[in-house]
């Protein structure tokens, strides 16, 4: 009887530990956006079971863990850290912002690194149209 109770307790403990520990994962995966030049762009990212630090990268260049991003005055990382929300806001978007972005969550304890990509396409406000003229014949 004692052996059965010990086995039952052991199974129960394993189940509790297995359900209590879940890997961090994206609750909201960043989605690609198309914005007009000058508009605000918000790339969303939300993480469940957050354990690691979160940052955004632009074309492979890490932007850092702070909400204020050095060298990028139009960029801010904002959201609700308690709920794992780390959105990237770009104000007055320009053609230099047209890039591939990645929400990155670092490793911690037994949690693995996770990454999710989204592209930002900035549409030029003004397009230049050119007309091709056919040469005119001179009549003498």
Task: Tell me the role of every PLM-derived stretch.
Residues 22-24, 48-76:
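N-terminal V-set
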Residues 55-57, 100-125:
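Extracellular/luminal immunoglobulin-like beta-sandwich modules
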Residues 32-34, 74, 115-119:
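Well-ordered beta-strand positions in beta-sheet-rich domains
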Residues 28-32, 130-135:
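Surface-exposed, proline-enriched loop/turn segments that connect beta strands in immunoglobulin-like
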Residues 3-10, 35-44, 51, 81-85, ...:
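Solvent-exposed loop/turn motifs of extracellular immunoglobulin-like beta-sandwich domains
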Residues 60-62, 81, 109:
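Solvent-exposed strand-loop boundary residues in beta-sheet-rich modules
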Residues 1-31:
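N-terminal Sec-dependent signal peptide, specifically the hydrophobic helical h-region
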């Amino acid at each position: 009887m004692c052996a059965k109770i010990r086995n039952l307790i052991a199974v129960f403990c394993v189940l509790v530990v297995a359900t209590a520990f879940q890997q961090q994962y994206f609750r909201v995966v960043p989605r690609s956006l198309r914005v007009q030049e000058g508009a605000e762009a918000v790339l969303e990212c939300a993480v469940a079971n957050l354990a690691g630090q979160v940052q955004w990268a632009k074309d492979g260049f890490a932007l850092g863990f702070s909400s204020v991003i050095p060298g990028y005055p139009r960029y801010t990382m904002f959201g609700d850290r308690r709920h794992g929300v780390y959105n990237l806001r770009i104000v007055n978007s320009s053609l230099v912002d047209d890039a591939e972005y990645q929400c990155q969550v670092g490793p911690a304890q037994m949690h693995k690194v996770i990454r999710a990509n989204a592209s930002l396409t900035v549409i030029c406000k003004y397009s230049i149209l050119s007309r091709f003229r056919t040469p005119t014949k001179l009549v003498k």
